[in-house]
Amino acid sequence: MNCTEEFIAKMKQKDIVINFVQAWRNDTLEESYARLDKPTRLHAYSVSKSVTSIGVGLAVQEGLLRLDDPVLRFYPEYDPAELAPNLRRMTVRDLLKMGCGSKDKMFFWNDAQRLQCRDWQDYFLRNAFPYEPGTRFEYNNFNSYMCSCIVERAAGCTLKDYMTPRFFDKLGIGNPDWLTCPMGHSAGANGLFLSIDEMS
């Protein structure tokens, strides 16, 4: 029994369903397991956050934004005087570091208002932000969602469309599936669907 088979057997004992496993060493696929057809795309959940961060890096490389840009630079339609003081100090870097200064890690995503709110950016920008940005690590989806929206505002197209020729096409990932918010912006924090081969 190889390591992958041993791992799958242990997961089955715990009633944990594993769809795919690939073990690579020195660019060689050593072991694999597939419960489904390999081309099947599955929700990559928070792997999406890493891809969004790459999108921010590409935008920085192309001079569309800087990590120390204030978030509000990309929202000129908002009057800073009407927003939380900590939001006025928040930067793109703070979002990437999961340090927006929100009240808790499940900010918005477990909130009943999410079910009725269409404009997630507006919801974020009108939050109280009790903590100074960059001083607390609070893992939440909104940091990455806002990074996605900032790249969109800087590039003039959705994060998915921005990354397709610069990232997905170069990796052979054709027509990637990425869920959007009610306003049509790439979710950023999650919602990216990839096959095991596309992820590896």
PLM features per residue range, with description:
Residues K14-D15, N86-R89, Q116:
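Extracellular/periplasmic catalytic domains that process cell-envelope and extracellular macromolecules
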Residues K38, F107-N190:
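Catalytic-site signature segments of enzymes, centered on catalytic residues
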Residues C3-D37:
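A short, well-structured edge-of-sheet supersecondary motif
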Residues L83-P85, M106-W109:
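Short, conserved acidic/polar surface loops in the N-terminal third of protein domains
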Residues V47-S53, R89, Y139-S144, L192, ...:
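Short alpha-helical patches at coil-to-helix transitions and adjacent helical residues
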Residues V17, A23-R25, E30, R89, ...:
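N-terminal core-entry segment
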